[in-house]
């Protein structure tokens, strides 16, 4: 079995930091119709520059949704 090439690992890490990865999770546990536990998580792996860029865009989307909801 061939060993993984360290340069390809560095390329993958560079790409992840450049583009970022977001894992958005929502889980609810209920027993007999009674909600016992709710877990909501958003995990972001990115460079600071990438995160700040996308955080600004997400804030714009959320603000537009709030404005549209207030007008309705």
UniProtKB/Swiss-Prot annotation:
Keywords: Gas vesicle. Gas vesicles are hollow, gas filled proteinaceous nanostructures found in some microorganisms. During planktonic growth they allow positioning of the organism at a favorable depth for light or nutrient acquisition. GvpA forms the protein shell. Its main location: other. It holds the Pfam family Gas_vesicle. This is Gas vesicle protein A. Belongs to the gas vesicle GvpA family. Gas vesicles are about 100 nm wide and 200-400 nm long, and located close to the cell surface. It comes from the Archaea. It is found in: Gas vesicle shell. NCBIfam families: halo_gas_GvpA, PRK09371.1. The gas vesicle shell is 2 nm thick and consists of a single layer of this protein. It forms helical ribs nearly perpendicular to the long axis of the vesicle. GO terms for molecular function: structural molecule activity. GO terms for cellular component: gas vesicle shell; vesicle membrane.
């Amino acid at each position: 079995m061939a060993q993984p090439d360290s340069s390809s690992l560095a390329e993958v890490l560079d790409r992840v930091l450049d583009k970022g990865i977001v894992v958005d999770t929502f889980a609810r546990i209920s027993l007999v119709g009674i909600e016992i536990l709710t877990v909501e998580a958003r995990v972001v792996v990115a460079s600071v520059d990438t995160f700040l860029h996308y955080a600004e865009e997400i804030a714009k989307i959320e603000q537009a949704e709030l404005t549209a909801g207030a007008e309705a």
